[in-house]
Each structure stands twice: as structure tokens, then as C-alpha cells.
């Protein structure tokens, strides 16, 4: 019986982080959490991390698709914050972004992890970007590291 389990170091891996500028004061903390996890826990070298800024969360999938198609990266981390307002706009942005990233991930066999907050208010966003509720950017980076390792091990079992 073969069992594949993930590891968390990925020092020779290349990772792209796509960051939404909208709600930048929250996303900045998510990015810092992701970078800290990649470097300190994952041992990923600074020169192997590409940071790309886009206007908002809705624009992340377009860039993720472009990066995935290049085949140059081992994972993508999406960073953004969607805060519920008075209209249903929140739902559409969150659903479209999430489903698009999932589709890109499966289409290109590339881990894309979500450091995207979907919250009811600013307070919840602040709590999830490094205070009471941890840092979802850090969580997304950790998931990316684990998925990189699972994919590398799985390729050896399937293709070699």
C-alpha cells in the first residue's frame, strides 16, 4: 500500500502570490503572513516568490490563469478581502472568484490556495488577518506548501 503525505518545506519551489489592492490595509497583513510562512516554515527563497498586484479580488483568476498556463510556478496563493455590503455584489464576486480559481487549479494541475477573506464586516476581516482568528494568508501559504509536496510525490508514483 502506498501512502502519500505532505511535507511543509519546499525550498526550491517557485510560488506566485496574487494580491488584490482593494482593501489593501487588510490584504497587506495577509501577505505578510503568507510571506513569513513561506520563508520561515517552507524555506522558500525570496527570489522564488513572485508578487503580483491586481485591482481587486475579481481580477485574481485572470492572472492566475496566465501564471498557470506558463508552467513556471509550483503553486499560486490568492490574497484578497471581500466584505459584505448592502447588495448581493459580495456573493457574486466571492462565488465567481472561488469557482474560477478552482477551475484553473484543476485544469492546469496546479495548487491554487485561497487567502481570500469573505467576511460580514471590517472587524471580522481584521481578526482573520493576524489578530484573534490567526492569519488566513499564512494558512493559505501552508496549504500551498503541503500541496506542492503532495503533487511532487504523486508525480513520482504516477509517472515514474
Swiss-Prot record:
The keyword Transferase applies. The active site is at residue 89. It comes from the Bacteria. InterPro entries: LS, LS/RS, LS/RS_sf. It is an enzyme of class 2 (transferase). Gene3D superfamilies: Lumazine/riboflavin synthase. Keywords: Riboflavin biosynthesis, Transferase. It catalyses: (2S)-2-hydroxy-3-oxobutyl phosphate + 5-amino-6-(D-ribitylamino)uracil = 6,7-dimethyl-8-(1-D-ribityl)lumazine + phosphate + 2 H2O + H(+). GO terms for molecular function: 6,7-dimethyl-8-ribityllumazine synthase activity. GO terms for biological process: riboflavin biosynthetic process. Its EC number is 2.5.1.78. One of its GO terms (cellular component) is cytosol. The keyword Transferase applies. Pathway: Cofactor biosynthesis; riboflavin biosynthesis; riboflavin from 2-hydroxy-3-oxobutyl phosphate and 5-amino-6-(D-ribitylamino)uracil: step 1/2. (2S)-2-hydroxy-3-oxobutyl phosphate binds at residues 86-87, 128. 5-amino-6-(D-ribitylamino)uracil binds at residues 22, 57-59, 81-83, 114. Catalyzes the formation of 6,7-dimethyl-8-ribityllumazine by condensation of 5-amino-6-(D-ribitylamino)uracil with 3,4-dihydroxy-2-butanone 4-phosphate. This is the penultimate step in the biosynthesis of riboflavin. Forms an icosahedral capsid composed of 60 subunits, arranged as a dodecamer of pentamers. Belongs to the DMRL synthase family. This is 6,7-dimethyl-8-ribityllumazine synthase. It comes from Buchnera aphidicola subsp. Acyrthosiphon pisum (strain Tuc7). The gene is ribH.
Amino acid at each position: 500500500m502506498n501512502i502519500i503525505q505532505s511535507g511543509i518545506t519546499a525550498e526550491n519551489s517557485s510560488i506566485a502570490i496574487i494580491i488584490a489592492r482593494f482593501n489593501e490595509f487588510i490584504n497587506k497583513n495577509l501577505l505578510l503572513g503568507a510571506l513569513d510562512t513561506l520563508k520561515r516554515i517552507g524555506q522558500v527563497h525570496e527570489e522564488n516568490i513572485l508578487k503580483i498586484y491586481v485591482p481587486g479580488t475579481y481580477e485574481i483568476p485572470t492572472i492566475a490563469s496566465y501564471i498557470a498556463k506558463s508552467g513556471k510556478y509550483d503553486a499560486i496563493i490568492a490574497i484578497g478581502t471581500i466584505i459584505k455590503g448592502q447588495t448581493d455584489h459580495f456573493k457574486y464576486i466571492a462565488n465567481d472568484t472561488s469557482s474560477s480559481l478552482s477551475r484553473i487549479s484543476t485544469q492546469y494541475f496546479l495548487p491554487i490556495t485561497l487567502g481570500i477573506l469573505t467576511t460580514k464586516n471590517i472587524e471580522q476581516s481584521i481578526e482573520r488577518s493576524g489578530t484573534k482568528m490567526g492569519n488566513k494568508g499564512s494558512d493559505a501559504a501552508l496549504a500551498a506548501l503541503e500541496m506542492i509536496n503532495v503533487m511532487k510525490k504523486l508525480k513520482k508514483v504516477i509517472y515514474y
